[in-house]
Amino acid sequence: MKTKLITSFIFIFLFANISNAEIKNIGNNEIKRLMSLGIPLIDVRRKDEWVSTGVIKNSYMHTFFDKDGKYDLKSFITKIKKISNSEKGIILFCRTGRRTTAIAKALEKINAFPKVYNTKGIKAWFLDDNELVKYQ
């Protein structure tokens, strides 16, 4: 009986830790569609970048990497969970998609959000003549 119980717990533990997170790369039209459904867009760039280019209206500014490339994943997740309905997921946004790809992989590894939508960033947004607003 004990052996069956221990085996059951091991089985449950192993399968409970399998990542159900999903990373999906999306384009600008999909960004707009998902935002219209209430999925938050998290702009992970630095303040100097927001000031320089502007930001997407109704996005959330939460820097991930500082100017030295350092980050605090736990703090970032705590901030994002305050604004995200974890069922719907989050949209990550940076300059070119490079930073958000790294962040998405880190979030997937620990199953922080069920869905992480990765974008091509501000450069692709700008090239498609999409609207930006002044950072305030």
Regions picked out by a protein language model, each given a short descriptive name:
Residues 92-94:
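Short, surface-exposed ligand- or partner-binding patches at beta-edge/loop junctions that are enriched
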